[in-house]
């Protein structure tokens, strides 16, 4: 029986009996029945029912869930078992490369991690804009000058408020420009980044049912205030609202909207067009992708693309480019990142799982028995698939990137010497591509291991001024040194570069695409002839020489040479075709490449800063012996997806610009501030390339950030333009909105003798606010006084009992009616001149040490009799300078916005459908088979 059924029947039985003992017996029986059904466990689904049943009836129910056995002790760190586990785990974590000699894994165990913050492309159309100046209703006051008649409230009016500046503190007054910058950054982070509206909150116009009201942009508040028809103050406004409307044009895709906005909000909406996400038409890129994939595929769009469909632009940040020129470490990190991206794209599965069969055939041909423990069997020991793949990837990457080759592995056996002889033919050996030391080492290896012993010459030892064996011996003929071998050495000493497959379109972003300068069809090409010459000459010399092999028996050596000649000369053509097959296809997306620049032409010193890539010496021979099938057909879907990923990465890298812009502006405001510290504290790296900035040594980073060209590039960015425009708007807004009520004023007029109060606006009875300081009064800027400039002039005005104005943001101390009733310091300040700005501390320093705090008096209460206010607060010597309140306009302004859907995408491949029409054989673009048996 099911557990839930048992519980239900037990409930019925328990309710049927009266005594508690009988209830407990039935309950215990129920629990034992459930446990017998479920191996001593109570199922989770019936446990709450049982607990509830026990609580209701006051029964005892004890149940402890069975815990699974767990090992509490930590494993013994010295135990062999746990060490093996750790070793396996770390090997699996990330295998960097295989040491082809020992077949051991070199394992990369990270010792520190960089947290990446992905860039979320947050699409914010214009209707998401939250207005900074809100609206509120205020009532005018009609003051009475007679005690027996109280003040009256007049008409209502709708005003803009200034709550956006209610967060300025005393510390921010000292550094007001930084406050404005922080405010601008805050606004920039929420500013719309699409220059159109995608939806509107609308409602029927209650004052004209044929029209529509827009409730976005804070307009709902305005319509709510004037909706009270009993309030006759707004009669004129209600008549104006009749003409408010939203007109949508379906052909031009625009919307004309009636809005009442504060000038500050209007300015910010104008700045939106500078803040848009950089994009490009999707249809153009779709067409490009279709053309690229036309090799063996038909790519058709899955659906029709609207004319407003956009794709994020392929932006190449000039700031990143300049950073790469300044920091070799950053440049190498970026190149390495690009190289890692390319690795999965190459089609290199041309090897069988093992080269042992080919090696066995060669050994059999050389009549070597494995029972003979002679050095012959180790001649090809370092030849394996791992080194073949590693070398092939290096060759392919060498066509797109420029890096240094560092040959590794055993360099003292027959196999590596034959392989080095092939390397000197296939790899680019010119000075721009291969360093002199590497070239000399390869030449010396070929000479000492293959040529010297065979032609009966002494082995070559490097000396000053004579470092290359080929140069030393190329002109010394005679003996067994046949002209075939000399022809090979001459050809190698030409140091031939690779041919340019495609020139770069921007050498600061991508380098030329190069390919081996070897014909893929003509077997009489110089390179094949040179290899043939070498082997013919060696075979000829070995026949005349009774002891031609250095470590190998003479017969075996001669036969090894013959079999090597067949393998090497026949397999170079498939290798060249394989390289061209890969490169000519990947070059189709050259326009979408990641960063691959080689900055040697721009900065010659970068020759030593290239990446150094380890190449197994035996790799070329491994390829020659192992290549035995055609590669897979090219997968255009993955290649074009790679182009999408690169575009997204470049877009993410651009996020670095905004943080550098903010650091630069902060430094412009106060040059003593560190740009480096700000960047390191606030950077949220989106890619591992940007994260590598934090690994730069401190002093190096400081000097990089001081670079004039880098700073100029930062000043040319979109982010810099937007931030500066917002700063100007915020500064103008501060000057033109009332802020005294938030504890901050534009300045203060200080008088030697208290003067009578005035009334600044109709919304207060009395206050000490002035909108315009009197003409002819000397002005002092707060920033000057804080720096000690013109302080003596200010003291001079005090001594001469002359009025003066301090302009600049000043903190005010509001004194309300309650403070006035008890005679406080506010009363004293009113009647003692200059007290607000002259302190003994300032006199000692000869400058204003702390920005002065001035008093702000305001009385808006209509209940107080007239004389009561006059007696205490009739005069003051401090007047606060502030801006008048802004009245919301009667008639709406019509704004025209584009009206369309958000159709911004980061991926193009998803919009295409790929249909394969490839031929059964893998061919080059000229129709030649890549591999033919």
Curated annotation (Swiss-Prot):
Gene Ontology molecular function: RNA binding
Top-level taxon of origin: Viruses
GO CC terms: T=2 icosahedral viral capsid; viral inner capsid; viral nucleocapsid
Major localisation: virion
Subcellular location: Virion
InterPro entries, alphabetized: Rotavirus_VP2
Keywords (A to Z) from UniProt: Capsid protein, Inner capsid protein, RNA-binding, T=2 icosahedral capsid protein, Virion
Subunit structure: Homodecamer; each decamer is made up of two conformers of VP2, called VP2A and VP2B. Interacts with a VP1-VP3 complex. Interacts with the intermediate capsid protein VP6. Interacts with NSP5. Interacts (via N-terminus) with NSP2.
Described purpose of this protein according to its UniProt entry: Inner capsid protein that self-assembles to form an icosahedral capsid with a T=2 symmetry, which consists of 120 copies of VP2, with channels at each of its five-fold vertices. This capsid constitutes the innermost concentric layer of the viral mature particle. It encapsidates the polymerase VP1, the capping enzyme VP3 and the genomic dsRNA, thereby defining the core.
Similarity field: Belongs to the rotavirus VP2 family.
Protein name (database record): Inner capsid protein VP2
The species this protein was found in: Rotavirus B (isolate RVB/Human/China/ADRV/1982)
């Amino acid at each position: 029986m099911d557990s839930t059924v048992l519980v239900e029947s037990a409930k019925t039985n328990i309710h049927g009996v009266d005594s508690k003992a009988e209830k407990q017996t039935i309950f215990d029986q129920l629990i034992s029945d459930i446990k017998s059904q479920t191996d001593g466990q109570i199922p989770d689904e019936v446990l709450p029912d049982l607990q509830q049943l026990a609580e209701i009836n006051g029964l005892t129910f004890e149940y402890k869930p069975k815990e699974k056995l767990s090992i509490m002790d930590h494993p013994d760190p010295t135990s062999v078992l746990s060490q093996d586990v750790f070793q396996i785990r770390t090997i699996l974590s990330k295998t960097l490369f295989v040491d082809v000699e020992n077949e051991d894994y070199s394992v990369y165990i990270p010792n520190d991690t960089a947290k990446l913050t992905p860039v979320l492309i947050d699409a914010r159309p214009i209707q998401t804009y939250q207005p900074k100046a809100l609206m509120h209703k205020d009532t005018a006051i009609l003051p009475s000058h007679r005690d027996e008649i109280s003040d009256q409230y007049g008409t209502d009016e709708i005003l803009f408020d200034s709550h956006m500046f209610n967060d300025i503190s005393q510390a921010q007054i000292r550094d007001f420009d930084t406050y404005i910058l922080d405010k601008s950054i805050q606004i920039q982070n929420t500013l719309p980044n699409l220059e159109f509206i995608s939806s509107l909150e609308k409602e029927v116009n209650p004052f004209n049912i044929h029209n529509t009201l827009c409730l976005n942009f804070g307009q709902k508040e305005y319509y709510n205030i004037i909706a009270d028809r009993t309030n006759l103050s707004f009669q004129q406004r209600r008549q104006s609202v009749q003409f408010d409307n939203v007109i949508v044009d379906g052909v031009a895709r625009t919307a004309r909207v009636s809005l009442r906005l504060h000038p500050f909000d209007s300015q910010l909406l104008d700045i939106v067009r500078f803040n848009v996400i950089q994009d490009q038409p999707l249809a153009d890129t779709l067409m490009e992708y279709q053309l690229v994939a036309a090799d063996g595929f038909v790519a058709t769009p899955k659906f029709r693309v609207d004319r407003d469909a956009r794709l994020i632009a392929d932006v190449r940040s000039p700031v990143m480019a300049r950073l790469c020129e300044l920091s070799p470490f950053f440049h190498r990190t970026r190149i390495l990142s690009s190289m890692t991206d390319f690795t999965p794209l190459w089609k290199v599965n041309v090897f069988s799982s093992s080269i042992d069969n080919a090696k066995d055939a060669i050994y059999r041909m050389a009549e070597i028995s494995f029972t003979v423990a002679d050095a012959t069997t180790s001649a090809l020991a370092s030849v394996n698939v791992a080194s073949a793949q590693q070398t092939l990837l290096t060759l392919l990457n060498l066509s797109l990137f420029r890096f240094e080759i560092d040959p590794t592995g055993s360099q003292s056996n027959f196999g590596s010497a034959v392989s080095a002889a092939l390397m000197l033919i296939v790899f680019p050996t010119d000075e721009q591509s291969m360093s002199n030391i590497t070239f000399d080492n390869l030449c010396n290896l070929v000479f000492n291991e293959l040529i010297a012993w065979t032609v009966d010459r002494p082995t070559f030892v490097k000396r000053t001024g004579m470092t290359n064996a080929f140069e030393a011996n190329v002109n010394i003929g005679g003996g067994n040194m046949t002209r075939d071998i000399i022809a090979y050495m001459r050809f190698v000493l030409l140091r031939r570069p690779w041919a340019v497959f495609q020139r770069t379109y921007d050498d600061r972003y991508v380098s030329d695409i190069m390919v081996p300068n070897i014909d893929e069809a003509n077997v009489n090409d110089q390179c094949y002839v040179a290899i043939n010459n070498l082997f013919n000459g060696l075979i000829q010399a070995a026949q005349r020489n009774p002891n031609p092999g250095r470590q190998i028996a003479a017969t075996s050596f001669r036969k090894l040479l013959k079999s090597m000649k067949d393998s090497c000369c026949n397999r170079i053509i498939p290798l060249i075709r394989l390289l061209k097959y890969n490169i000519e296809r990947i070059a189709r997306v050259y326009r979408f490449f990641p960063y691959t620049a080689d900055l040697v032409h721009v900065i010659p010193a970068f020759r030593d800063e290239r990446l150094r890539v380890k190449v197994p010496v035996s790799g070329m021979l491994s390829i020659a012996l192992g290549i035995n099938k055609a590669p897979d057909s090219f997968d255009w879907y993955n290649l074009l997806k790679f182009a999408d990923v690169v575009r997204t990465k470049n877009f993410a890298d651009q996020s670095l610009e905004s943080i550098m812009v903010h650091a630069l502006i902060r430094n412009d405001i106060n040059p003593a501030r560190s740009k480096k510290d700000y960047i390191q504290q606030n950077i949220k790296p989106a890619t591992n390339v940007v994260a590598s900035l934090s690994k730069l040594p401190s002093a190096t980073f400081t000097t990089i950030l001081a670079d004039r060209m880098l700073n100029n590039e930062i000043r040319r960015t979109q982010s810099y333009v937007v931030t500066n425009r917002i700063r100007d708007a915020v500064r103008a807004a501060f000057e033109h909105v009332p802020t005294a009520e938030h504890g901050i004023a534009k300045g203060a007029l200080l008088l030697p003798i208290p003067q009578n109060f005035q009334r600044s606006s109709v919304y207060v009875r009395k206050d000490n606010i002035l909108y315009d300081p009197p003409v002819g009064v000397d002005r002092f800027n707060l920033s000057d006084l804080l720096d000690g400039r013109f302080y003596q002039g200010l003291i001079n005005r005090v001594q001469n009992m002359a009025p003066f104005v301090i302009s600049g943001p000043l903190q005010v101390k509001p004194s309300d009616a309650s403070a006035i009733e008890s005679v406080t310091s506010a009363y004293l300040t009113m009647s003692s001149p200059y007290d607000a700005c002259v302190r003994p501390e300032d006199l000692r320093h000869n400058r204003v040490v702390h920005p002065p705090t001035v008093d702000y008096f305001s009385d808006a209460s209509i209940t107080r009799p007239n004389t009561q206010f006059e007696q205490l607060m009739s005069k003051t010597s401090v007047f606060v300078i502030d801006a008048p309140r802004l009245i919301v306009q009667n008639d709406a302004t019509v704004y025209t916005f584009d009206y369309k859907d958000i159709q911004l995408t980061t991926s193009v491949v998803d919009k295409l459908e790929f249909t394969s029409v490839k031929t059964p054989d893998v061919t080059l673009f000229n129709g030649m088979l890549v591999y033919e048996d």
